[in-house]
């Protein structure tokens, strides 16, 4: 997308202004925080107290006015972001950016997020409809006022169209897609075809037997004994489709969407401590979702106050409800549950593609007509196919092989907005658990704490039940094996209330061990963050919000600490005993000023390349390599020799370079690459020298194999709450700021606090809000809704 926007330079020429005048002209587009503003759709006045970080604390007389106000404020601060997400969710990016995003739009249309959103709206019920309509009224009131149009709209010469309730739902499903766990089944199916199932099994993800699970052994007490957690045999069918159809289609179509617009990554930390482990003798809950770091931030903080719904926390612009936060009695946090929620099904079509083969015979293929409007060009009209298994992924070019349909749990309509609203309204553990039962996608690990002293864990979401287990590769649409037989019930999902250990820790690690009778997934995040959090929790017997916030900043990498002796051995063997001594003494802290992180991580990445490139080029799973490093041998090659070779390769570039010189975070704005304009407006936030790494609690991860190791995702928000003092300790913080206007003082004013782990309290008692400005939203005189 960055290349698409270089043409925006013409706008600068049209301004006929100097750089300073340009900044002044654009800066005038930032709306003031105070005053009175009429809002169509309101029935009564709504008071907004702005604190010094630009967080709105909203007081309304009923929920509908509250959500109208949230919609208005979201649009006021983040309308460009909302509009971009809406176009991405609906596969309409080409309306903004022209022909170069047609491939991405075709892929996004295949996800059918608009169809799902329409189905969700049908099941939302009267209250859900009112909530979503109220939010849309607020957004549209801001669009209609016509002032303070974000500079991004000027650059691409576009105006936001009216907001509809289904747009919010489509954005919600876009987030679910970003959090999916597609896993490595397609790559492994291809490996099985080339090298055989036995060899592919050696590359399959494994979770260490001794690594921590979220639900410890002995805590699962279900009386049910059906199903199987065991993997199905590796399948080799139909790998031609996997390799040539899906992979290349993904790279050419979904790939651009993923790089430019996706905001989410499957990782986070959340933990809750019981009363016996805290200084206040009340639970303390902590959460930091690890998502793509971008500008503006994914999240928007609010204090939401109306009778029956008083919640503080993080919202997503475009979605009307608090997603993560707490009320006066209870709170919750999320991490991705890593559920295996997407399967691919190879379909056998008739010669004219009008029918497809099923286990019960031939069925008629559904044909979906699509029209993509293209800025500066003629519309693209085409047809795509759908089967009972899901939408059929389009082939790339003239590649051979059977077509693949995609089965995804989020294709079934569910009411997450209603569930989140009910969670915010809950007053105790039973009412919260009842509300959570409606939350189905994306699947989440949910940690819970309340003022009554309870702590709990729940796996929330749809977990498919597969006929015959879960294999690798694509299932065959004409066979029963691998097909879905519904979902686990709420009673069958893992849960844990007031565990004996008096804490719950989740870091995308395995949910539960072999005692659990149902299949959830085979792919979990490696256990290092969970192990380190457990170390810190067990060392802190009288925790406070200060000590918990400090734990969120921890930069000890358990994995790098474990492999440092191996790196030291390799360094000594290559003639650098001085480096070997330093590595043996290193504690695993990924500090910007230390050189050991640079050397160890560079060595590990080079070793990963050497180990895999001879057998599975382009597919380098971490889990098997970590297992082989722990055992000291690989089934594929001479691991010791490769360790020495990797060290010899990286020493010249990595031996004495501080981690901070190669590891930085830039929170990028989509328009930052536009020459001159990006620099004038300082769209990006960064580069920031950031401690931590891929496996630290304070994550600063990169998915690049080559140095320098730029960090691309990390803590997108931090939240800590002590239920002994919800308004006096803990708080929230974002990595950028509240505003989407680059020249606003609130565009990047939280960054320093985020780096230092300094949280910002959002009081539930409005009398304790330290407001710096007051905005009153009033009905516009047209009678409200």
Predicted regions mapped to residue ranges:
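N-terminal Sec-pathway targeting helices
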Residues: 1-15
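Substrate-recognition/specificity elements adjacent to catalytic centers across diverse enzyme folds
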Residues: 20-284, 289-295, 313
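Proteins synthesized as precursors that undergo proteolytic processing into mature forms
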Residues: 103, 114-115, 136-137, 413-444, ...
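A terminal-accessory region detector
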Residues: 164, 576-666
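Glycine- and hydrophobic-rich flexible loops that cap the catalytic core of alpha/beta enzyme folds
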Residues: 250, 263-265, 306-321, 325-330, ...
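Hydrophobic alpha-helical segments
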Residues: 441-540, 607-608
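Terminal end segments
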Residues: 519, 523-576, 657-785
């Amino acid at each position: 997308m960055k290349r698409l926007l270089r043409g925006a330079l013409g706008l600068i020429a049209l301004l006929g202004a100097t750089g300073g005048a340009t900044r002044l002209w654009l800066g005038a587009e930032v709306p003031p925080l105070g005053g009175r503003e009429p809002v169509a759709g309101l029935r009564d006045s709504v008071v907004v107290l702005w604190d010094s970080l630009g967080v709105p604390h909203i007081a309304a007389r009923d929920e509908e006015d509250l959500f109208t106000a949230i919609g208005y404020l979201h649009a006021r601060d983040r309308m460009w972001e909302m509009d971009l997400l809406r176009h991405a969710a609906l596969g309409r990016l080409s309306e903004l950016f022209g022909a170069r995003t047609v491939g991405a739009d075709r892929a996004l249309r295949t996800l059918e997020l608009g169809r799902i959103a329409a189905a969700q709206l049908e099941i939302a019920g009267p209250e859900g409809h009112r909530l979503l309509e109220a939010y849309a009224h607020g957004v549209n009131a801001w669009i209609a006022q016509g002032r303070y149009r974000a500079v991004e709209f000027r650059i691409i010469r576009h105006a936001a169209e009216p907001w509809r309730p289904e747009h919010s739902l489509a954005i919600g499903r876009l987030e679910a897609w970003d959090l999916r766990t597609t896993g490595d089944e397609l790559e492994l199916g291809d490996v099985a075809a080339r090298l055989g199932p036995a060899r592919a099994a050696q590359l399959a993800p494994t979770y260490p037997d001794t690594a921590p699970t979220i639900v410890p052994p002995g805590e699962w007490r279900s009386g049910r004994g059906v199903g199987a957690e065991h993997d199905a045999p590796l399948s080799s069918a139909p790998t031609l489709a996997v390799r040539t159809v899906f992979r290349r289609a993904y790279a050419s179509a979904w790939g651009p969407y993923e790089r430019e617009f996706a905001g989410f990554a499957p990782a986070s930390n959340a933990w809750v401590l019981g009363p016996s482990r805290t200084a206040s003798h009340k639970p303390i809950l902590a959460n930091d979702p690890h998502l793509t770091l971008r500008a503006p931030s994914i999240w928007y903080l609010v204090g939401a106050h109306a009778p029956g719904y008083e919640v503080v926390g993080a919202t997503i612009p475009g979605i009307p409800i608090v997603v993560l936060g707490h009320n006066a009695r209870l709170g919750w946090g999320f991490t991705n549950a890593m559920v295996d929620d997407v399967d691919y099904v190879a379909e056998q079509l008739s010669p004219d593609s009008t029918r497809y083969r099923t286990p019960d015979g031939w069925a008629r293929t559904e044909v979906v007509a699509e029209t993509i409007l293209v800025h500066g060009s003629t519309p693209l009209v085409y047809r795509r196919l759908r089967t009972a298994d899901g939408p059929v992924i389009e082939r790339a070019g003239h590649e051979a092989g059977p077509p693949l349909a995609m089965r995804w749990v989020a294709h079934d309509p569910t009411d997450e907005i209603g569930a989140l609203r009910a969670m915010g309204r809950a007053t105790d553990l039973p009412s919260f658990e009842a509300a959570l039962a409606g939350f189905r996608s994306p699947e989440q690990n949910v940690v819970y704490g309340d003022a009554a002293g309870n702590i709990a864990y729940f796996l929330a979401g749809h977990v498919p039940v597969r006929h015959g287990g879960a294999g690798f590769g694509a299932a065959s649409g004409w066979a029963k094996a691998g097909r879905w037989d519904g979902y686990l019930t709420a009673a069958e999902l893992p849960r844990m209330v007031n565990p004996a250990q008096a804490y719950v820790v989740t870091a995308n690690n395995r949910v539960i061990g072999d005692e659990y009778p149902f299949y959830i997934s085979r792919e979990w995040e490696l256990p290092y963050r969970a192990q380190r959090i457990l170390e810190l929790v067990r060392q802190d017997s009288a925790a406070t919000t200060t000590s918990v916030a400090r734990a969120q900043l921890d930069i000890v990498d358990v994995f790098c600490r474990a492999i440092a002796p191996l790196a030291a051995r390799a360094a000594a063997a290559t003639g650098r005993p001085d480096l070997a001594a330093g590595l043996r003494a290193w504690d695993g802290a990924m500090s910007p000023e230390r050189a050991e992180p640079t050397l160890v991580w560079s060595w590990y990445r080079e070793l990963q390349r050497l180990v895999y490139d001879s057998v599975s080029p382009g597919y380098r799973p971490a889990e098997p390599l970590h297992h082989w490093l722990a055992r000291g041998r690989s089934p594929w090659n001479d691991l010791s020799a490769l360790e020495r070779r990797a060290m010899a390769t990286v020493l010249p570039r990595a031996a004495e370079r501080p981690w901070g010189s190669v590891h930085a975070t830039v929170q990028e704005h989509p328009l930052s690459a536009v020459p001159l304009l990006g620099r004038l407006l300082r769209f990006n936030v960064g580069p920031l020298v950031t401690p931590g790494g891929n496996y630290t609690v304070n994550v600063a991860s990169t998915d690049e194999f080559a140095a320098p190791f730029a960090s691309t995702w990390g803590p997108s928000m931090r939240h800590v709450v002590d239920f002994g003092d919800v308004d006096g300790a803990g708080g929230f913080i974002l990595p950028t700021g509240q505003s989407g206007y680059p020249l606003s003082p609130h565009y990047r004013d939280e960054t320093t606090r985020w780096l230092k782990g300094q949280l910002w309290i959002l009081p539930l008692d409005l009398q304790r809000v330290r407001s710096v400005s007051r905005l009153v939203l009033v009905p516009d005189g047209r009678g409200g809704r």
